[in-house]
Amino acid sequence: MMSNLPLDLVEEILSRVPATSLKRLRSTCRQWNALLKDRRFTEKHFRKAPKESLVLMLKEISVNLNVTPPSIEFKDALGLKDSHSNSEQVDIVQVLHCDGLLLCTTKDNRHVVWNPCLGETHWIQFKVDYGRVYSSFALGYIQNNESCRSYKILWRWKSNDYKSSPRQRGFEIYEFISDKWRVIDDVNHDSLVNHNYLGRCCRVSLKGNIYWLVDDVEDNSRSLLMFDFKTERFKRLCLPHFENVGHMVLSFVREEQLSVLYWSRATPKMEIWITNNIDTDATLLWRLHLDTRFNCVRIFSSLYFEEEKKVVLCCNVKLLMMIRSARTWYTLSERTMDI
């Protein structure tokens, strides 16, 4: 029996258990519960456990197009309960993934960091300021040493004073260690004045830093903006050269490389580009990985990319009579497309 095994052997076995199975093992005994909470074990599990891919949908809506459906099955729905009230479920409207954690924004504009595998939550408190609009939050971390990470949240906001030009903007950092917010006074605001952030489908958190697709309103160009949580500074990075600005979705591959899904406004052309690295000190290089052409609705908001099989799962968001949104999943390859 497992209880008769040495603790180091138990740790070695559990470090290879898939993350989705760890939650129900915590109730086995106090010793296992303490082990699964240990940061050293978390790092070991991250290195040795088999990698799993989860597709998270906030709403499930079926649309029958009278065609053969793709071989995709959605199961094991995730549900977040509110520890601050008696409500059964929290209505989540936005999600950002970082290092196995989900930064969730609720319908009533509250924010929580959630570990869906372990069922742990951390609700974020901040002072509500109704003079600030266009708020957005991003989750990242700094690597203190080989086995310790300090998580932070970046809060980006603009004032609602339309008379001021440029409009006042600010950045604040929340640190989990201190459980406090602080203003970033020396961030390079000037380089950000003429940038428009392109929404939820154009930001990702990767290796502790946050990346956005941004438009430069002066020269009608598009670039990649990174926020380094260690230096707490912004850095502009290059994108591949495109025929026109077009539409883009930012994502990542195996939590190691950035990827951009691009489709032209003028032609049915669609491309997927992948970076060679995300080293903050090196020049960002892109390579074309997938090039295809097809006619369909191409306003995608998110994607899951499987590099070896050259398959991408795209989520398409459409407004139906301006009342509700429906989501249609497309599976693309170099030769075929299934809806």
Swiss-Prot record:
User: Which InterPro entries does the annotation name?
Assistant: F-box-assoc_dom_typ1, F-box-assoc_interact_dom, F-box-like_dom_sf, F-box_dom, SCF_F-box_component
User: Locate the F-box domain: which residues?
Assistant: 1-49
Q: Which Pfam families match?
A: F-box, FBA_1
NCBIfam families per record: F_box_assoc_1
Protein name (record): F-box protein At3g22700
Taxonomic lineage: Eukaryota, Viridiplantae, Streptophyta, Embryophyta, Tracheophyta
